[in-house]
UniProtKB/Swiss-Prot annotation:
Organism this protein belongs to: Homo sapiens
UniProt-recorded Gene Ontology molecular function terms: mitochondrial proton-transporting ATP synthase complex binding
Organism lineage: Eukaryota, Metazoa, Chordata, Craniata, Vertebrata
Disease named in the record: Mitochondrial complex V deficiency, nuclear type 2: A mitochondrial disorder with heterogeneous clinical manifestations including dysmorphic features, psychomotor retardation, hypotonia, growth retardation, cardiomyopathy, enlarged liver, hypoplastic kidneys and elevated lactate levels in urine, plasma and cerebrospinal fluid.
UniProt topology in membrane: Multi-pass membrane protein
Tissue distribution of the protein: Lower expressed in the heart than in the liver (at protein level).
Targeting presequence: 1-81
Record-given protein name: Transmembrane protein 70, mitochondrial
Domain of life: Eukaryota
């Protein structure tokens, strides 16, 4: 065996037989190229061992594999489990992700920063008020202070009112049929709203910034962004018997009106 590992010419004359000899020879050879060259230049008795022949030729075939690291068969499932992304968390299954989350966050940050800059310059403006009032007409002063006030106060409040119901992520817990909606609060921190499917109320009239009401809170989602359409149907309650009967009655009434 030592002669075979060192590539000695005496290894050719040694009889190699049995499974242990073939496996030890395969482990002793340092690389596929060395094993192939040594196996091609040697000959000896061989026999079938689990689909491979013993001897140097069998060892060469055992080592004739790609140079990358091989993962044992019994590890493949574990490695595949670690590398497989999961959409489940302690909050439930992730069924929706808003594509405007970064834009909402960036616009609100910009609005807050401009408000802070405006508030920083207000003391300086007030100190220079006497000099400005003498040279600038009163209407222009009113317009100027109105613009400053809108940037510092009105714009952040308006943006928060518009985007407070925008859902960043939505989770669903199937066992309890509850949902968890993640939104931004006034301080740009993520806040959660937990509600049951029975708490979902669809507004009678269409609202630009409201898709449904969860208890008393208005939430905004984009139906197109649901990877599974059934999740949106179940969220809105469109799979309930009451809604199906209502739609059938509505379609029948419309059909009768068209016939008349």
């Amino acid at each position: 065996m030592l002669f075979l590992a060192l590539g000695s010419p005496w290894a050719v004359e040694l009889p190699l037989c049995g499974r242990r000899t073939a496996l030890c020879a395969a482990a002793a050879l340092r690389g596929p190229r060395a094993s192939v060259s040594r196996a091609s230049s040697s000959s000896g008795p061989s026999g079938p061992v689990a689909g491979w022949s013993t001897g140097p030729s069998g060892a060469a075939r055992l080592l004739r594999r790609p140079g990358r690291a091989q993962i044992p068969v019994y590890w493949e499932g574990y490695v595949r489990f670690l590398n497989t992304p999961s959409d489940k968390s302690e909050d439930g299954r992730l069924i929706y992700t808003g594509n405007m989350a970064r834009a909402v966050f960036g616009v609100k940050c910009f609005s807050y920063s401009t408000s802070l800059i405006g508030l920083t310059f207000l003391p300086y403006i007030f100190t220079q008020n006497n000099a400005i009032s003498e040279s600038v007409p009163l209407p222009i002063q009113i317009i100027f202070y109105g613009i400053m006030g809108s940037f510092t106060v009105i714009t952040p409040v308006l943006l928060h009112f518009i985007t407070k119901g925008y859902v960043i992520r939505l989770y669903h817990e199937a066992t309890t049929d509850t949902y968890k909606a993640i939104t931004y609060n006034a301080m740009l921190a993520e806040t959660s709203t937990v509600f049951h499917q029975n708490d979902v109320k669809i507004p009678d009239a269409k609202h630009v910034f409201t898709t449904f009401y969860a208890k008393t809170k208005s939430l905004l989602v984009n139906p197109v962004l649901f990877p599974n359409r059934e999740d949106y149907i179940h969220l809105m309650g469109y799979d309930k018997e009451e809604f199906i009967l209502y739609m059938e009655e509505t379609s029948e009434e419309k059909r009768h009106k068209d016939d008349k």
